[in-house]
A protein has these predicted regions:
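C-terminal catalytic and target-recognition region of SAM-dependent MTase-like enzymes
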Residues: 90-93, 97-184
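Conserved S-adenosyl-L-methionine
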Residues: 1-95, 111-112, 118
């Protein structure tokens, strides 16, 4: 996942963190449009809304230990490292005890994979692991043209996107909706 943007963004959403909270904006320098007090009051309000005590089950995996270290550091810098469990793990070891959940993945493809002959087997393994999580959904970004074929299932939705290269796809493999929780 190249530094774990998906798990980090999920943790930030779970903790009610405003996107871009640690960066500056050109609009801050436009006091004639947005007064400084209004700007800083909004920033203070956004900080007060953060809840790092939220319980999460967000996990990030990569087979490359260096990428896991980078992901942990990125999560620490974003302030959500306590909300994510990172682990060195290959897709062949993907399993989870929960009945419902979802996978967000951007597996290697094309230039990101040293040996392109490994792609069919990688995507078959993704499909096998996903089938075992039969109540889960999977959201997959790839430029690999044979993804659906090798996964062994046609995506419920397929969108073309641009991920620094043409013909990148966002596949949505939808599982059943979990039952609604009842307030106790």
């Amino acid at each position: 996942w190249g530094g774990a943007p998906s798990p980090i963004e999920a943790a930030m959403m779970a903790a009610n963190m405003a996107p871009g909270r640690n960066r500056s904006f050109t609009a801050e320098e436009w006091p004639h449009i947005i007064g400084k007090k209004v700007w800083y009051d909004a920033m203070d309000e956004a900080e007060e809304m953060i809840d790092l005590s939220v319980e999460t089950d967000i996990q990030g995996y990569d087979i490359d230990e260096d990428m896991v270290k980078i992901a942990r550091e990125n999560a620490r810098m974003a302030g959500v490292d306590k909300l994510i469990h990172f682990q060195r793990r290959g897709v062949e070891d993907l399993h989870h005890p929960k009945k419902y959940g979802f996978i967000i993945t951007n597996p290697p493809y094309g230039e990101r994979l040293q040996d392109k002959s490994q792609m069919p087997q990688l995507y078959r393994t993704i499909g096998e692991r996903f089938r075992e999580l039969d109540s889960w959904s999977m959201y997959l970004i790839t430029a690999y043209e044979q993804a659906e074929k090798d996964i062994g299932r046609k995506a419920d939705k397929n969108r073309k996107i641009y991920n620094r290269m043409p013909k990148t796809y966002y596949y949505q493999f939808l599982g059943p909706k979990p039952p609604k929780r009842r307030d106790v």
